[in-house]
């Protein structure tokens, strides 16, 4: 079975995971809406992150910061001055592209192994490569580009009734800065001592020129970020700790070790704030792509905000009787990207037929904790609806369940397989007498008979991780 993005996207759209944005108006380039199943899957992923990184973690607390911030925030963070992409236009078809992405795609398509990441190249190095290899325009195939120029990725808007410079604000390009400006507030009210972390889940916006690959790269996206504050000199130890913690979280939810890799950034490609960065990458059908960036941001952010705001952001260590600016380890995960990774990892086409009767089952093997629908409740006949609905009402108090009484039982099982439902409960005519139901396991397709009054206990630990 060849796992392709086309197959996954087709099922995702057909079953209600993801729809094209603004579809009845012809859409808006690279915007996507999460459907009835997609929103459940994404919420489950966010809950799983929050559970392990915030709720169960003794070091960390959470916040939810505003998307719009004082513009001085972005002066201090460096985003207004240095947050840009290298762009070039094709003089023939007038399409605009990111120079680094043109080079990466060309190298991949032509089997060229790049010695270093293009992220660390200068504009001159990119131009030289494009000329040396006669890289064509991805749109028209010609070889006539403009010079490379930098394009700021921040979305600009205006606050108030007049659109002038003093009312300019920006949609945040990352959630991290809201955490940094609230460092002292959170430390004071939570009474946390170093080391401790502040986590946040929220929307960010980047005016990407070449988004693509379904929901992998979009202009509006959601992040799950942790800023972990530690004593200078202990940052390498904590960097390794969180790198392993993030990797283990993915494995615990069903990502296989051979589907991901850890890639350290070359010194030339490091972000301006980073002492060291490791990306956790996932092998999508279209190739390797970053899921998680774990960065040692040192004291860059707190130092810059202290300088620009004039506020003291140092931490007083009462055990050592000294003040210092904490270093920061940042594990930053894209919610949309990791949802796509879970979709890709879980998708399967299983040959369950015989030579005489071929049969292929499409199934999403989601970890039960992530599955959009936990239990499908299926009456064998509509004559049994009244009793089956009572079972549904009982289970749906605890789990997100789906009730389906249309079609043959075999087709209903297949529908639940195709949306990744881990368990199906079938209420049949025997249930009227023995007060039991048949529970079918999605992955093994095995069935067992369980008493209705024991269902809560049966499912109690099925969805833990």
From Swiss-Prot:
Task: Indicate which residues the UniProt annotation says bind ATP.
Answer: 206-208, 216-221, 290-291, 334-337
Q: Which UniProt keywords apply?
A: Aminoacyl-tRNA synthetase, ATP-binding, Cytoplasm, Ligase, Nucleotide-binding, Protein biosynthesis
The entry's localization annotation reads: Cytoplasm
What is the gene name?
A: glyQS
* NCBIfam families for this protein: glyS_dimeric, PRK04173.1
> What is the official name of this protein in its record?
Glycine--tRNA ligase
User: Disulfide connectivity?
Assistant: none
What GO biological process terms are annotated to this protein in UniProt?
glycyl-tRNA aminoacylation
